[in-house]
């Protein structure tokens, strides 16, 4: 068996008619199948929930984020919501410290005019080297203070004295002395020791009454009456109930009548 040797063919020369050459090449290579739009099946198309890749639609992502945030405890959700809000805290106001000279000047103006006009406020602020807002605020506070002082007169003189008079501990002795003065006008009055008695000194009052009665009896009868100090456990009835030399100045002694 002999092998036929054929010389290699050179490049085929193309004719001037390109369409004829294209047809000849297509007939030699065989028919090629080109896909048509109808060849695509409905199953190969991605559905509404399927995408080409691992990405998910934004609606599904937002639903998952909402579900995840709902699982958080209430304090964390509150802090998460507050962290997104802007910081609306105001800076604290700075109080103006007036000097004594400024306060004296403002008080002098307030005594004449409690309300300032805009021109007067501007002039006063320029003279005192303050702002109009500071002048206006000071006058507002001063008017409120003046109103409180007018409503409560005690604010004018807080240390003028006590509001209530102290109780009189010498009412009994003074009434007794007045009665003795009416009975015996020439009897001397008792000294001021009754005014110096401390509160609650019952025996001191009795002693003063005894001395007053003794002095009155001596002036009436010519000799002093016997006065006995109170004994513990037995109240003293005073010298008015003791015996005396005359019936005009002494009362009968009390005893067991029955």
From Swiss-Prot:
InterPro entries: HD (IPR001356), Homeobox_CS (IPR017970), Homeobox_TF (IPR050848), Homeodomain-like_sf (IPR009057). Signal peptide: none annotated. Pfam families: Homeodomain (PF00046). One of its GO terms (cellular component) is nucleoplasm. Residues 91-150 bind DNA. One of its GO terms (biological process) is cell differentiation. It is found in: Nucleus. CDD domains: homeodomain. Keywords: Developmental protein, DNA-binding, Homeobox, Nucleus. Residues 1-32 have a biased composition (Polar residues). GO terms for molecular function: DNA-binding transcription activator activity, RNA polymerase II-specific; DNA-binding transcription factor activity, RNA polymerase II-specific; RNA polymerase II cis-regulatory region sequence-specific DNA binding; sequence-specific DNA binding; sequence-specific double-stranded DNA binding. Expressed in bone marrow of patients recovering from chemotherapy. Also expressed in an erythroleukemia cell line. May be involved in ventralization. This is Homeobox protein VENTX. The gene is VENTX.
């Amino acid at each position: 068996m002999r092998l036929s040797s054929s010389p290699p063919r050179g490049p085929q020369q193309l004719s001037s008619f390109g369409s004829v050459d294209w047809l000849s090449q297509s007939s030699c290579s065989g028919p090629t199948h080109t896909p048509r739009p109808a060849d695509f099946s409905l199953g190969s198309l991605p559905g509404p929930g399927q995408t080409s890749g691992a990405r998910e639609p934004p609606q599904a992502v937002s639903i998952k984020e909402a579900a995840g945030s709902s699982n958080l405890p209430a304090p964390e959700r509150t802090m998460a919501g507050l962290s997104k809000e802007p910081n609306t805290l105001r800076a604290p106001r700075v109080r103006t410290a007036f000097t004594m000279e400024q306060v004296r000047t403002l008080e002098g103006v307030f005594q004449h005019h409690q309300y300032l006009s805009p021109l007067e406020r501007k002039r006063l602020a320029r003279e005192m080297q303050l702002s109009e807002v500071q002048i206006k605020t000071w006058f507002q506070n001063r008017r409120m203070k003046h109103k409180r002082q007018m409503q409560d007169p005690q604010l004018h003189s807080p240390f003028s004295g006590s509001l209530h008079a102290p109780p009189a501990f010498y009412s009994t002795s003074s009434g007794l002395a007045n009665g003795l003065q009416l009975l015996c006008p020439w009897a001397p009055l008792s000294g001021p020791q009754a005014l110096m008695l401390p509160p609650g000194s019952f025996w001191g009052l009795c002693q003063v009454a005894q001395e007053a009665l003794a002095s009155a009896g001596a002036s009436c009868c010519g000799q002093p009456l016997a006065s006995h100090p109170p004994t513990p456990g037995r109240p003293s009835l005073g010298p008015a109930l003791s015996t005396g030399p005359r019936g005009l100045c002494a009362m009968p002694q009390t005893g067991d009548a029955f």
